């Protein structure tokens, strides 16, 4: 009987007697408020004959946040973490008093998810991390992580220990946290899924909030043949904002020259110039009036040699030397579509050093041949037997 009575008191006005009522709006016993937002809780009391008196009590109740109206008091919650706690409204008619408590929970759950790595590569074991920033509350009772394959949890993923760290805040007294969940992934098969998703859920009284972040998976564009030392397997990485390509060895294979997508906006394409030792060509076959230019390269674009001519732009390493590992990006205007290429670090042979090495080897060979001829001449020339101790090394 007591639980039913408590539920009735929480859900509606309290019918005390003829001409009397005690009401709290919103009537829920627990209220969740987003940090930085405001909420007003109205507590009212009506009496038939006596004067109605209403008061708010609770943890650090600031009278400046209570607005007094005839027969009611309005409590304003400012959405600060200090507002978290229980507030009690007390109403009285003459000698009779009644009360209703409200538990206020201020939460912070911005859409600030960070996932690493930026993309997944099929065929290898990997660790995926998902970090939610500026979170409160951060306990496991209210915050949970999931690694999804579509709408289902990814089978075989091993969840590692969750890490929690306090965020640096400009305003003191605001203990927000960053929470990181890591998973050890099994080797993704081929063909792989287009993407995995990190999903973070905050569950509060009568409120469930969810944020999700996409982790693209590199898709092989070549036929499933065994890899060799003379060919590399290019990958295409697609996302909702940009189209990116990645290759594990540009020195032995040209990038695919077919359009990355046959639908939607036209994107520029990146190729390796086979006529140069190492040169990238970005071009756009998107009609007249378009231009392309390089916008990103490992290190600094100033360290590369650039040539741009309308819908074509070339980029090469100058001077010859090791190629930094990282992303190369080309942009097309108008439209702003970009294409990115990931290149692993490699060393380009220097022609001058190759010539010097060849000449040095030739000179050493000639010296060795001359030494051998000298020793044979001393051993087999007519006359007394010579001392051949100097040629024993042969």
Curated annotation (Swiss-Prot):
Residues 219-255 are annotated as: Mucin-like. One of its GO terms (cellular component) is plasma membrane. GO terms for biological process: cell adhesion; cell-matrix adhesion; heterotypic cell-cell adhesion; integrin-mediated signaling pathway; keratinocyte differentiation; leukocyte migration; leukocyte tethering or rolling; positive regulation of leukocyte migration. Residues 1-19 form the signal peptide. Gene3D superfamilies: Immunoglobulins. The keyword Transmembrane applies. The chain crosses the membrane at residues 354-374. Residues 20-353 are extracellular. Detected in Peyer patches and mesenteric lymph nodes but not in spleen. Residues 20-107, 108-225, 256-345 form the Ig-like domain. It is found in: Membrane. InterPro entries: Adhes-Ig-like, ICAM_VCAM_N, Ig-like_dom_sf, Ig-like_fold, MADCAM1. GO terms for molecular function: integrin binding involved in cell-matrix adhesion. It is a single-pass type I membrane protein. Disulfide bonds join 43-89, 47-93, 130-198, 282-330. It comes from the Eukaryota. Residues 375-394 are cytoplasmic. Glycans are attached at residue 42. Keywords: Cell adhesion, Disulfide bond, Glycoprotein, Immunoglobulin domain, Membrane, Repeat, Signal, Transmembrane, Transmembrane helix. Cell adhesion leukocyte receptor expressed by mucosal venules, helps to direct lymphocyte traffic into mucosal tissues including the Peyer patches and the intestinal lamina propria. It can bind both the integrin alpha-4/beta-7 and L-selectin, regulating both the passage and retention of leukocytes. Homodimer. This is Mucosal addressin cell adhesion molecule 1. It comes from Rattus norvegicus. The lineage of its organism: Eukaryota, Metazoa, Chordata, Craniata, Vertebrata. The gene is Madcam1.
């Amino acid at each position: 009987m007591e639980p039913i009575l408590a539920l009735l008191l929480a859900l509606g006005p309290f019918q005390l007697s003829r001409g009397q009522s005690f009401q709290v709006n919103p009537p829920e016993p627990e209220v969740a408020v987003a940090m930085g937002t405001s909420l007003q809780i109205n507590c009212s009391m009506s009496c038939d004959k006596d004067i109605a008196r209403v008061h708010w009590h609770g943890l650090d109740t600031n009278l400046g946040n209570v607005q007094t109206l005839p027969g009611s008091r309005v409590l304003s919650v400012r959405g600060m973490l200090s507002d978290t706690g229980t507030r009690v409204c007390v109403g009285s008619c003459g000698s009779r008093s009644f009360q209703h408590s409200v538990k206020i929970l201020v939460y912070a759950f911005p859409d600030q998810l960070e996932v690493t790595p930026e993309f997944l590569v099929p065929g290898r074991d990997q660790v995926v991390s998902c970090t939610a920033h500026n979170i409160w509350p951060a306990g496991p009772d209210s915050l949970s992580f999931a690694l999804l394959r579509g709408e289902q949890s990814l089978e075989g993923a091993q969840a590692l220990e969750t890490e929690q760290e306090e965020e640096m805040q400009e305003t003191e007294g605001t203990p927000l946290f960053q929470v990181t969940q890591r998973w050890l992934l099994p080797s993704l098969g081929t063909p792989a899924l287009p993407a995995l998703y990190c999903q973070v859920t905050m569950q509060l009284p009568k409120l469930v909030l969810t944020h999700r972040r996409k982790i693209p998976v590199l898709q092989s564009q070549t036929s499933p043949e065994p890899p060799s030392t003379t060919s590399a397997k290019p990958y295409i990485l697609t996302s909702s904002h940009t189209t990116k390509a990645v290759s594990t060895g540009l020195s032995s294979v040209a990038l695919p020259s077919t359009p990355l997508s046959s639908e939607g906006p036209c994107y520029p394409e990146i190729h390796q110039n086979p006529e140069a030792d190492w040169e990238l060509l970005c071009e756009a076959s998107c009609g007249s009036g378009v231009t392309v230019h390089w916008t990103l390269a490992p290190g600094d674009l100033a360290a590369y040699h650039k040539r741009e001519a309308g819908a074509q732009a070339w980029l090469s390493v100058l001077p010859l030397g090791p190629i930094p590992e990282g992303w190369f990006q080309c942009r097309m205007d108008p439209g702003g579509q970009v294409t990115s290429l990931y290149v692993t670090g490699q060393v380009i042979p220097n022609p001058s050093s190759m010539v010097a090495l060849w000449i040095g080897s030739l000179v050493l060979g000639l010296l060795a041949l001359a030494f051998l001829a000298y020793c044979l001449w001393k051993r087999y020339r007519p006359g007394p037997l010579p001392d051949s101790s100097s040629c024993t090394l042969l």
